[in-house]
Amino acid sequence: MNRFFFALLVLFTVPVLAAPQDDQYTLGPDSQIQKSVPQGKVIQMPAWTNSKIYPGTTRDWWIYVPAQYKAEQPANVMVFCDGGGFVKLDGPFRVPVVFDNLIAKGQMPVTIGIFINPGAFPTSNPKDKPRSNRSFEYDSLGDLHARFLIEEIFPEVAKIYQITSDPEGRAICG
């Protein structure tokens, strides 16, 4: 009986291991800066340190504003959790570049991007690494993370840019 299960394991594992692996992902044209496309701007915001929902944490965050943004018209908004990995113009995702290209082609509406990293608790010793709050923020059941965005981050962004309050104009990923 054990040989039977071992044979099944080998039968299903070997083809998977022998299958050719994908080469590294090649960025498509929408991930490349196009000289003819107006480029939005990425603003690194001051570290967020005054959270009432996640007290004691500090986090880095950025706002992307498309070139087509007009202050008199509410923009859609998309939040990127683990935002530091998505906001880099030369990184693996290049979201600001993709947004620039898709907005310019009319394939997506004018959308402000909020790129936010999970919080961390600073240490008293600068040599120590801060304790991450990522798992608590992203993996906990409940409404804390949604409330953090709706009650703290969106109002802060709305002090500078007009963003939609329509749920159909909001998205989150990461």
Show which residues each predicted segment covers.
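Bacterial N-terminal signal peptides
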Residues: 6-15
